[in-house]
């Protein structure tokens, strides 16, 4: 079993992202969204549903993902009903009709090779398949909008904080011996006067300990970096 995440530009119908994950979780979104931003730019707003990843019933509060997007000045607009997200739902059906038979024919059984092919299929769809509503390939509509100055996308400029903003962060205590918890062990980090560190879990399975959280001023100070994880924990 796997979950597919899709992102589409509402104006041009360009598929800006399509990717399979072992399951739908926060870490999957933190991997998926920046991929699309890097390829196509950062939008002013995203049209989403009332999933708990995007919406909280506590007035004045933001979800972790919404807080991350706010850092980039991306607002969230909420679809009132599932039918209101018809464009993206049709693309879910589009892939459900094509992908299983394609993977079966190509002998693809793992997510990594499936995602490699998805990138190629998505690009082919954007550039060569005429959309029945706009009567042109999505990529052509995209380029036309850019030429006519109808795009509000902002260039994606990766600053040093980029990989840490798109991680799951938590504060951990630094013990008197200068160690922090790492999986089922403890590791010694770069000596610091601080009594706590920021634990960052990345989508590639790696873990970073920072001295300060994003937005604290100055560049990130890395206290420890762990890159030996075999696979990302797709359950957070």
For the regions a language model picked out, list residue spans one by one.
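RNase H-like DDE/DDD metal-dependent nuclease/strand-transfer catalytic core used by mobile genetic elements
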Residues: 1-4, 10-113, 124, 218, ...
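Generic secretory/membrane-interface signal
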Residues: 3, 43, 79, 119, ...
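Short, acidic, Ser/Thr-enriched surface-loop or helix-capping motifs
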Residues: 9-10, 202
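A general structural signal for well-ordered alpha-helical packing
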Residues: 92, 96, 115-122, 139-143, ...
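Long, charge-rich alpha-helical interaction segments
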Residues: 111, 116-119, 123-133
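C-terminal, beta-rich DNA-binding module of retroviral/retroelements integrases
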Residues: 126-236
